[in-house]
UniProtKB/Swiss-Prot annotation:
GO terms for cellular component: host cell; host cell cytoplasm; host cell endosome; host cell nucleus; T=1 icosahedral viral capsid. Residues 5-41 are annotated as: Nuclear localization signals. The gene is Cap. Belongs to the circoviridae capsid protein family. This is Capsid protein. It comes from the Viruses. Gene3D superfamilies: Circovirus capsid protein (2.60.120.950).
């Protein structure tokens, strides 16, 4: 038995969003107590600040494996050009907070370089870095859960994380990753707060290993103020 062929195209349904599928499967999430409540973000300005600098792991003649250990802290002063006149800051805002930081390692060594190695980066949020050294006999970040390896010296490497402000060097805790409760810091005219951080350990080589490091900082500002000088410098 044969059926007559349809002479029209079936109407396709509108594609459903993934969020809609989740809510249909879990209707209790629609309850006002659990659903996402949109909040006004008036007066908050999102910016992206970047800087690039060179970094060199110096050559060594020692043939036993060793690692050059270093650290990276982030300060908004390094990303903002200096102000002029009586206004010491070039950004007319009163408060800021750093949402995210992206660190990119761009290798610059020649491809004909014969030595190879394996380095590490680890996210350190409590300012408890391993002491800086040029020839440590082991990789100090090898057992860190946040460790990512760097095939040296030709591979591109990047890290993306939420830095934490160093508000008190005598304490060993940091603020949680919560957007609603993240602290707003005052944009100072003299020196701003350091944020931590990224620990690095590069395996030494008989050649110099050159990198261009590009740091991109995602910052939020609030309380726009054009008064010169600021209200409370």
């Amino acid at each position: 038995m044969t059926y007559p062929r349809r002479r029209y195209r079936r109407r396709r349904h509108r594609p459903r969003s993934h969020l809609g599928q989740i809510l249909r499967r879990r209707p209790w999430l629609v309850h006002p107590r659990h659903r996402y409540r949109w909040r006004r973000k008036n007066g908050i300005f999102n910016t992206r600040l970047s800087r690039t600098f060179g970094y060199t792991v110096k050559a060594t003649t020692v043939r036993t494996p060793s690692w050059a250990v270093d650290m990276m802290r982030f300060n908004i002063d390094d990303f903002v050009p200096p102000g002029g006149g009586t206004n010491k800051i070039s950004i007319p805002f009163e408060y800021y907070r750093i949402r995210k930081v992206k660190v990119e390692f761009w290798p610059c060594s020649p491809i004909t370089q014969g030595d190879r190695g394996v380095g590490s980066t680890a996210v350190i949020l409590d300012d408890n870095f391993v002491t800086k050294a040029t020839a440590l006999t082991y990789d100090p970040y090898v057992n860190y859960s946040s460790r990512h390896t760097i095939p040296q010296p030709f591979s591109y490497h990047s890290r993306y994380f939420t830095p934490k402000p160093v508000l008190d060097s005598t304490i060993d805790y940091f603020q949680p990753n919560n957007k609603r409760t993240q602290l707003w810091l005052r944009l100072q005219t003299s020196r701003n707060v350091d944020h931590v951080g990224l620990g690095t350990a590069f395996e030494n080589s008989i050649y110099d290993q050159d990198y261009n490091i590009r740091v991109t900082m995602y910052v939020q500002f609030r309380e726009f103020n054009l008064k010169d000088p600021p209200l409370k410098p």
